[in-house]
Amino acid sequence: MTQPEFKLKKNVKTLLDEAAAKTKGISAEAAQEKLGDDHTVFVDIRDVRELERDGMIPGAFHAPRGMLEFWVDPESKYYKPVFVPGKAYILYCAADWRATLAAGVLAEMGMSQIYHLEGGFEEWKKAGRPVGQRPHSPHKPKA
């Protein structure tokens, strides 16, 4: 594949580095210790097709990457009350790139205690950590 004739102001690596500097990573081992903790919310930001295909961390809240900022903002008509002050949030995606970027944005929005799962869900599964199935919406029949 040939390289395009232009340069971006910031490339993906720069964006990831900037986001990582604003947030904290958490290992799969340390994250597993937080499972079931009332003050910690696991947030799966993967596409719904990934959840259907690969499962998810048991008890995680699914917030699609494209809606996350809207669901976090209490001034948005899309706000979800799972996002409240005083809780820790562990964001994850497949490999940790989207989660790192998302965690950086949430930190910019003023949220604290935001973590991204190092290595993402792939690392979580590879280490033999618990995996559950995506809960189906009560409004849609199972296929």
Over which residues does each language-model region extend?
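Short, surface-exposed ligand- or partner-binding patches at beta-edge/loop junctions that are enriched
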Residues: Y92
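Active-site flanking residues adjacent to catalytic metal/cofactor-binding acidic residues
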Residues: V43
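Rhodanese-like catalytic fold shared by cysteine-dependent sulfurtransferases
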Residues: M1-T40, V48-A88, W97-A143
